[in-house]
Amino acid sequence: MSTTTGPEAAPKPSAKSIYEQRKRYSTVVMADVSQYHVNHLVTFCLGEEDGVHTVEDASRKLAVMDSQGRVWAQEMLLRVSPSQVTLLDPVSKEELESYPLDAIVRCDAVMPRGRSRSLLLLVCQEPERAQPDVHFFQGLLLGAELIREDIQGALQNYRSGRGERRAAALRATQEELRRGASPAAETPPLQRRPSVRLVINTVEPSAVRGRPQVESIPETEEARKPDQARTTSSADPTSPDLGPRGPELAGLQAERDVDILNHVFDDVESFVSRLQKSAEATRVLEHRERGRRTRRRAAGEGLLTLRAKPPTEAEYTDVLQKIKYAFSLLARLRGNIANPSSPELLHFLFGPLQMIVNTSGGPEFAKSVRRPHLTLEAVTLLRDNVTPGENELWTSLGDSWTCPGVELPPEEGSPYSPEFYNGWEPPATDPQGRPWEDPVEKQLQHEKRRRQQSAPQVAVNGQQDPELETESQLEEKARKWVLCNYDFQARNGSELSVKHRDVLEVLDDRRKWWKVRDHQGQEGYVPYNILTPHPGPQVHRSQSPARHLETSTPPPPPAPAPAPTQVRPQWDSCDSLNSLDPSEKEKFSQMLCVNEELQSRLAQGRSGPSRVTPGPRAQEPQLSPRSEASVVRAWLQTKGFSSGTVEALGVLTGAQLFSLQKEELRAVCPEEGARVYSQVTVQRALLEDREKVSELEAVMEKQKKKVEGETKTEVI
């Protein structure tokens, strides 16, 4: 994909603008005043900047900054008069800086490394400053050589009174304008180079039946399954993406969406670069203010003041909207981009987002940015991939950032459409002349339709169709219930606060955070590792709390329940842990341990400490309050805890370990304390169940002996 310029780059000049430029030159040349549109790139103070002691050092540092994307070009007017060189604001014509000709030490055109066109170099020495300033400019309509000749001609005229060189330079300038040459149209201006655009690529097309194919963008979760990832032939005719138009058009759409994503990243990087330059300029101004002895403005402060001006509120809103838009685009293109992938680019966006939130005064401003809404896929991508630090930032931004658009009230006004700094617009129509839809808005509409289609159908008179009632009864049998083992406090609108011993209905258990519904009908996400299977509420189980309808007549008395059929419980069902036999209970405990281990590794990342591989489950020590320290140590090693955790807790007895609370374990083992507490809780539950079984067996044995005794008495 091609690299495009950023917001500071000047667009290709139109014929009218070139005409106006020529007209301005023709009117000012007679007064020995010329004016040029330039981009100011950077200013170095020799001796003050790190490693910048000569002009050559400044040129090398500029090349390094450009390769790192740290150059922020700022458009302005450079005016040359018989006595001075002045820098003006291009809009207000306000004077930013003024350099007398006797203060200009050097004027030259330099060729930075990796560029095909030269830059204008000005070295200015103010009488009040010990070291000179080095300025780099880039000509927009004329090359740096012509501007250099004009300034050097003015210097010669100022010092010797000879004006032939400047007159020749002005004639050359007019001749160049007549030819309509434009450096900006021939070569990209020196500026920030996007670091992401060069590596975002669509996935390699696969050859099917000798014909190159492009992966289409899936609209549903099922479309992302591995066996369907490369399906490129005819799709569902009702699909809002492909329909009968074929995979070739889908490939073009994917490329268009990737191009939009690249431009979004360009603008985000430009905004962050502007924030960094603004902060640097502010620090320099504050440093100069502290060391100033007079009230006279020092050299270069006009440029610094302009550069230190922070972005406006509208600009902050615009970049936050683009970040939200990028989240949805990344989720949509998850199967179409690689090197880097969507999750990797997701982490890349959180750095700028953190900086923007900090510089805008905290998360309150970002909370007010409601549009565009996030797609359901974007929320899923975020929830499944953010790190703990990123999750803290993400959840602090409120419901408009953590809830999908289908769960938020609709916003008034036209749909959001990004406007890019450099004026680029995506193609409006496809090769067949049909208008392209905005990819994020289309995905939001698709999710809304899917939500409406999945809603329960009710007749006009309020009575449900008998066939639908039968389906609901079948659905009721397949519903899944869980028991909450710990309190959990929601941190955002998408999560649900639950209490210990709450019985919850599971709505979605495909990821690490399960979507559940409580007895009040409230829905939200909770972590899966605080839940255990449960048979569900014993009263009115045939109706969900959210769907329960009161009737005017009391229900008839229930019929005698048939004898329960002994069926082996399935591990994906809602059977209670208490109803399992010891071997199955052990299997569930093992599954829970594996899930917790996976969660710990995912949260810790690749750089986390390695763990001891757990030994065979059959040889696992049985931990109880009566266990000695050696048994506790062996149990910790078997569970795969790190050596630090084993050394810290391996000196405790079973009773001491069982008495510790989660906060105390976290204080001793910050990284693994919570997991130790979870494992101890599971072990405690297993012990309690075994004791209940033993008590039940004792009662049954006593009852059996009593019955046998009564039988013997009757026989006698």
UniProtKB/Swiss-Prot annotation:
A GO term from the CC aspect: ruffle
Q: Domain of life here?
A: Eukaryota
Molecular function terms, GO-annotated: actin filament binding
The SH3 domain extends over 477-536
Q: What tissues express this gene product?
A: Detected in placenta, skin, mammary gland, bone marrow and stomach.
Q: Where is this region: Disordered?
A: 175-194, 203-249, 404-472, 528-582, 600-628
Q: What taxonomic ancestry is recorded?
A: Eukaryota, Metazoa, Chordata, Craniata, Vertebrata
Q: Which organism is it from?
A: Mus musculus (Mouse)
Question: Which GO BP terms apply?
Answer: Rac protein signal transduction
Q: What quaternary structure, including any partners, is listed in this protein's UniProt entry?
A: Interacts with ABI1. Part of a complex that contains SOS1, ABI1 and EPS8L2. Associates with F-actin.
As recorded in Swiss-Prot or TrEMBL, the protein's gene is named Eps8l1
Q: Where in the cell is it found?
A: Cytoplasm
PANTHER family to which the protein is assigned, alphabetical: EPIDERMAL GROWTH FACTOR RECEPTOR KINASE SUBSTRATE 8-LIKE PROTEIN 1 (PTHR12287:SF19), EPIDERMAL GROWTH FACTOR RECEPTOR KINASE SUBSTRATE EPS8-RELATED PROTEIN (PTHR12287)
Q: Where are the transmembrane segments?
A: none
Q: State the protein's purpose.
A: Stimulates guanine exchange activity of SOS1. May play a role in membrane ruffling and remodeling of the actin cytoskeleton.
Basic and acidic residues composition bias: residue spans:
435-446
- One Pfam match: SH3_1
Name of this protein: Epidermal growth factor receptor kinase substrate 8-like protein 1
Stretches assigned to the PTB domain: 35-164
Q: Which family does it belong to?
A: Belongs to the EPS8 family.
Where, if anywhere, are coiled coils annotated? 682-713
Instruction: Indicate where the modification Phosphoserine is found in the sequence.
Output: S182
Q: What is its main location?
A: cytoplasm
Q: Where is the composition biased (Polar residues)?
A: 453-464
InterPro entries for this protein: EPS8-like, EPS8_2nd, EPS8_PTB, Eps8_SH3, PH-like_dom_sf, PTB, PTB/PI_dom, SAM/pointed_sf
